């Protein structure tokens, strides 16, 4: 039997490359807090697999887009209601490693080639993941 090699590493932005905080002022959402080491790690990984980001945060999408593009990657706004179907149609979930922490990410994780949840993800998401970071 031929072993399948994943072609894509798809990461959900909020809670994966951010600490989940969204900082507001009286005018609305202004800031998200991103980890500083993500860029270096993903720069190494992108030599071996295509790295892409998704976000369902419509209000904060410009913030996420700026950070992801500064790191040299692509990002797509995908609301959770259509994410699984869109990813399967455009990438084929069996070709994807998926990393997420959100309430509906477990649905994608169950169909992906391999799935990762960051430490602190929701319990049912961690149970669906092949690996939980430490």
Feature roles, as predicted:
Residues 1-82:
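Alpha-helical substrate-recognition element adjacent to the catalytic core
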Residues 28-34, 70-74, 84-134:
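Mg2+-dependent phosphoryl-transfer enzymes with acidic/Ser/Thr/Gly-rich catalytic loops
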């Amino acid at each position: 039997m031929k072993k399948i090699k994943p072609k894509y590493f798809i990461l959900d932005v909020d809670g994966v490359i951010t600490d989940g905080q969204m900082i507001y002022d009286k005018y609305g959402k202004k800031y998200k807090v991103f980890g500083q080491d993500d860029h270096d790690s993903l720069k190494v990984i992108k030599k071996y697999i295509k790295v892409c980001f998704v976000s369902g945060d419509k209000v904060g999408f410009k913030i996420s887009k700026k950070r992801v593009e500064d790191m040299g990657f692509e990002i797509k706004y995908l609301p959770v209601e259509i994410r699984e179907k869109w990813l399967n149609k455009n990438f084929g979930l069996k070709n994807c490693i998926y990393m997420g922490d959100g309430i509906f990410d477990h649905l994608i994780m169950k169909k992906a080639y391999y799935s990762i949840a960051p430490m602190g993800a929701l319990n049912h998401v961690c149970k669906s993941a092949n690996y939980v970071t430490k």
